Amino acid sequence: MAFDPIQEDCHRLVLEALRRDNIPLTDGPSVERLMEQFTRNPAPLIVHDRDRAGHLIAKVVEAVDYRIPFIPDDTQAEQEEAAAENMLREAAALDPANWDAQRMLTALTAESNEEYVQYLVSKCDEVEHDLALKIASAQDPYEREAAGDLIRRPYLRWLAALASRALISGRYRMSLEAANRSLDFAPNDPAGVRHTAMLAMAKLEYPAEELRRFRSAHSVPYLANTPLRRRPKDAERDLDPWTLIALMSAAWRELDYEGAEHYLRILVRSCPHAAEALYFQTEFPDGVYARVNVGVGSTDELVLALSEAAPVLSLI
């Protein structure tokens, strides 16, 4: 459901090393050796400025998305955030075409969410055009391998950030349009924008039937995380929390209080400590790189969904 910056850094550096030494992509032992090198010490794999820029981003993500939000000491957190910002500035200078670096730096330095949204909107077509050029210009097997997945991800993260931040700013139609744009480009939805789309549709007061049609139209990523079930009622238990919240909101608006209570009961039973999470609705830190990694069906996933769904829940 989310992107792994360390895994991407490893993939990128290993692919570049194979290319430099003209090692076939099918050479399993060499790939394994390079991956072990990355785990031990990635420094020998970092040759070009773009390599270092990508590696810096992975380090920044570890800090700003997974460590700093949970540091209790404000002074230490501010120091680490300043260090992360400096690393992003270095990454952006080393590789001006690295859209992750540009976007994350703006996310950290923008004066407001609205300013960040405007930046994302203003550059979105440029990011898409740059990606199209990279895909079209891929010549060797290594470039084509990257073009099939790796170099597409910054664009998907861009659209996911736009969808998420537009939702926060109350621009629900813009949020839904960005999510649909991402789903059209990548139907497997590695960015998880379908969840943001569900919340935007709830705020736009789509009826419950429209929400179900949306899930059906984008069934591939939903099925990837859903166990096979024989009975429809059993399948309801596997609905993700974003869908359950959106359906609960739709039922409430339609004065279907029994239906709203039904989805609430499923939420309460969805994971350990669900009732506590629903009661406190703790704010979950918004990922700067992308939606943070949480386990499917976990309490953390529910807390994350509740945090993102704050605009929806405020009206229930």
Range-by-range predicted roles:
Residues 45-46, 60, 226-316:
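Long, ordered, amphipathic alpha-helical scaffolds
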Residues 181-240, 246:
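Glycine- and acidic-residue-rich phosphate-binding/metal-coordinating active-site segment common to enzymes
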Residues 80-89, 116-131, 172-181, 206-224, ...:
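Alpha-helical repeat scaffolds
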